[in-house]
Amino acid sequence: TPIIKEFVGMPKENFQQAQTSSIVYYTESKDRIPQIIQWSMDSDRETIGKMVCELSNTDLREEIQHIEVPTLVLLESVFSFSKDKIEQQYAKLPKKELRYANKGLHFVMYDDFDWYIKQLKEFIL
């Protein structure tokens, strides 16, 4: 696909710049930014391209009804403004807990570590 070709064919410097530019949407933890960017740089770009395509084109709203185990979904704080839409997306997931962080972005485990650990412990115990 064009997206995969773009990821694979992009010069390393351009790819790194793209990752650096977009990271502001994923974490507020400035000290973690180099690590997260390095993960991207170390990843297989064809796999990243496939992942982007799959995430953009795959609707699992029907399939999730077959998940039988209790499921914890941790969401970044910005999604709390769209609770109705989020709950619609997970409506068929039978044993779910949707929890919204009070702060942070995609890497909520870095942005609000204490909240993240608390949610995991409460869910598991």
Q: Where are the regions a protein language model picked out?
A:
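Alpha-helix C-terminal capping segments
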Residues: 10, 24-27, 88-93, 124
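Post-His helix in hydrolase/transferase enzymes
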Residues: 110-124
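Secondary-structure boundary motif
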Residues: 57, 66, 91-92, 125
